[in-house]
């Protein structure tokens, strides 16, 4: 087994295998702001699998997202009892939210991918890989040149990243996936 396989095995159950180091990380991350730029990836195996290389023009950002559903505003007018609910499920998954927040802070970059790095009872942390497509170190490399295409601009906001495609049901096709294309909104009437 190579190095990355061992790193991957550690993160199958980080509380057990990383122990005190994992707890210390979580405690430190709680004190930090929600979006922090990091020097090097916490999980090198996931970062390299998603296309990370230590080049100028590539950044890694750790994003904190609150877990759970969201509360709506209190309904002021009269309603029948069944309609009186304040909690609604999110329309997107937490990883997609983390990618969007990272990209809103770094508007000149595009999201390459993201991965889970930790969680506690209240928060989840994701590391998001951001690429500047107009940096010469990036657009001169064949593995990143596709980010220059017009249809990849603002890709995270249009559901084109891996985690967004997974949430939208676009990872599979054929039997059972008839109504996920072009989108759920196009196929299901409200």
UniProtKB/Swiss-Prot annotation:
It comes from the Archaea. InterPro entries: Rbsml_eL15_core_dom_sf (IPR024794), Ribosomal_eL15 (IPR000439), Ribosomal_eL15_CS (IPR020925), Ribosomal_uL23/eL15/eS24_sf (IPR012678). Pfam families: Ribosomal_L15e (PF00827). GO terms for cellular component: cytosolic large ribosomal subunit. Gene3D superfamilies: Ribosomal protein l15e. One of its GO terms (biological process) is cytoplasmic translation. GO terms for molecular function: RNA binding; structural constituent of ribosome. Keywords: Ribonucleoprotein, Ribosomal protein. SUPFAM superfamilies: Ribosomal proteins S24e, L23 and L15e. Belongs to the eukaryotic ribosomal protein eL15 family. This is Large ribosomal subunit protein eL15. It comes from Nanoarchaeum equitans (strain Kin4-M).
